[in-house]
């Protein structure tokens, strides 16, 4: 490269005036100047730009060095570093020089506690006042809002899982738990207990009791003997031993509820789906298959302490055997809703009888 530069800069003849022997100093100076120019040109020519691959490799090396430095900086602290951290933490918890706990003095803590005490005390006082005012407007005896109370729901006894009564007449173990459930449920309806606690009311009319809402109300008698063949007094097995089961139905209590138009609510049972002849005979007790008006209205559990919910017993005396029979019992009366699709207990109840022999 140097030879090429010299050949470009040198004249065509071999000997130049710069190398004349008659002026050696000037020749040397010119020679040095030429050498410097040649070196600069050679440096400019010989500097080759780096390729992209080389630049990427250098960048990767720099990144690796930076990562190593960061890892070294984030490594496990030495014993002195741990000791310094413990000292800082202990000083934060308690600084004996400035007598500070958690970076606060005793006066600062006292002010904070005092502020929070008054804040929460005021909050509790406001809540207490609101609750007291609310309870002044609510009667514990009669519900304030009853417009959206649903019509009476119904429930049956004895209790059966998924409302499926499945038993074998010849195997007492399959129906004995139904008998035990009915006996336990009817203990509060014993004649002696009803005569002692409740009064004998005339049938066919409401038992309305005037007076203050906090006065105790009397309740009408509903004796166990009213259920006759389904009372468990004549047949201790409630018909389950003969394949003629008894099922009791009651309405849920609603404060102030009265059957409309003075007509008692009646009960009617039939096959829900399938052959209607699967149930050929049903006996009801009381014989009217209704809830007498004398048990209404209901005044609430605080004043109507001895109130006994009236019952209607369904005695399935002739039901097809050895197959599942879906049964639907509905309430019939003015203002009673019994066709709610999404609630199977409003005004009706659906259960299954499967009596095996």
Swiss-Prot record:
GO molecular function, one term: inorganic cation transmembrane transporter activity
Acidic residues: bias regions: 52-73
Transmembrane segments: 111-131
Membrane topology, Perinuclear space segments: 132-357
Its job: May act as a transcriptional coregulator during muscle development through its interaction with SNW1. Has lost its ancestral function as a Na,K-ATPase beta-subunit.
UniProt record similarity statement: Belongs to the X(+)/potassium ATPases subunit beta family.
Protein's recorded name: Protein ATP1B4
Native organism: Homo sapiens
């Amino acid at each position: 490269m140097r030879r090429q530069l010299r050949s470009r800069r040198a004249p065509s003849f071999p000997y130049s005036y710069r190398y004349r022997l008659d002026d050696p100093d000037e020749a040397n100076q010119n020679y040095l100047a030429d050498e410097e120019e040649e070196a600069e040109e050679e440096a400019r020519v010989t500097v080759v730009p780096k390729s992209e691959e080389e630049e990427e490799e250098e960048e990767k090396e720099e990144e690796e060095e930076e990562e190593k430095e960061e890892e070294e900086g984030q490594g496990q602290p030495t014993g002195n570093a741990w000791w310094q951290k413990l000292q800082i933490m202990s000083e934060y918890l308690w600084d004996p020089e400035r007598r500070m706990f958690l970076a606060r003095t005793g006066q600062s803590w006292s002010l904070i506690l005092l502020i929070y005490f008054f804040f929460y005390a005021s909050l509790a006082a406001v809540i207490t006042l609101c609750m007291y005012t609310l309870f002044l407007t609510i009667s514990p005896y009669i519900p304030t809002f009853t417009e959206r109370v649903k019509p009476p729901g119904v429930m049956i006894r004895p209790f059966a899982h998924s409302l499926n009564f499945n038993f074998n007449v010849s195997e007492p173990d399959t129906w004995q738990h139904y008998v035990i459930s009915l006996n336990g449920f009817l203990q509060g309806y014993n004649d002696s207990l009803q005569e002692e606690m409740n009064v004998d009311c005339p049938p066919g009319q409401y038992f309305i009791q005037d007076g203050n809402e906090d006065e105790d109300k009397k309740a009408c008698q509903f004796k166990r003997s009213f259920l006759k063949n389904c009372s468990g007094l004549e047949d201790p097995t409630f018909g389950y031993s003969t394949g003629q089961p008894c099922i009791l139905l009651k309405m849920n209590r609603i404060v102030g509820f009265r059957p409309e138009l003075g007509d008692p609510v009646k009960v009617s049972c039939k096959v829900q789906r399938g052959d209607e002849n699967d149930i050929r005979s049903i006996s009801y007790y009381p014989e009217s298959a209704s809830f007498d008006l004398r048990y209404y209205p209901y005044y609430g559990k605080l004043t109507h302490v001895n109130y006994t919910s009236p019952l209607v017993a369904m005695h399935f005396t002739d039901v097809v055997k050895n197959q599942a029979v879906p049964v639907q019992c509905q309430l019939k009366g003015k203002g009673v809703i019994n066709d709610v699709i999404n609630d199977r207990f409003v005004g009706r109840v659906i259960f299954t009888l499967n009596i095996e022999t």
